[in-house]
UniProtKB/Swiss-Prot annotation:
This is Protein Ves. HAMAP family: Ves. Belongs to the Ves family. CDD domains: cupin_HutD_N. InterPro entries: RmlC-like_jellyroll, RmlC_Cupin_sf, Uncharacterised_HutD/Ves, Uncharacterised_Ves. PANTHER family: PROTEIN VES. NCBIfam families: PRK11396.1.
Amino acid sequence: MEYFDMRKMSVNLWRNAAGETREICTFPPAKRDFYWRASIASIAANGEFSLFPGMERIVTLLEGGEMFLESTDRFNHTLKPLQPFAFAADQVVKAKLTEGQMSMDFNIMTRLDVCKAKVRIAERTFTTFGSRGGVVFVINGAWQLGDKLLTTDQGACWFDGRHTLRLLQPQGKLLFSEINWLAGHSPDQVQ
């Protein structure tokens, strides 16, 4: 289990100066050729998402105004807060900010031939399904994960096991992504 606080994470500026990324975790850890990766991006200007051939991207708007996503011949989609949207990361996708507002989003990318991610928003205590990887990010409220207290802009990632996240207040929201490995693949094969 690895814990993080978004306010203390290192920031990587984009080459086009349209935003920045905070990498949460990758599997395998510290590898450029990853099977899955979770990150938080701040987008300051209209522009294109980076291309990642062979990957699927699920993007969830955390803060800011709605964002319009356009892929030339595949889709037009308005990204609304806390509504995950998946698309192939090897296609050109343009993001247009609403009214020029800066936005912040959660991204999880998985290699299409190896694993699949599912992203949900939780508003009550729950236990993960025992997947072989996952990430949680606290949107608001206070949550207990094992002996660790997680609050707004904090989270954790893991590479194995079942975990219970207990909401400690009457209300709270948590973004939760779980990784499932496709038949014939296992994280044990790459560690």
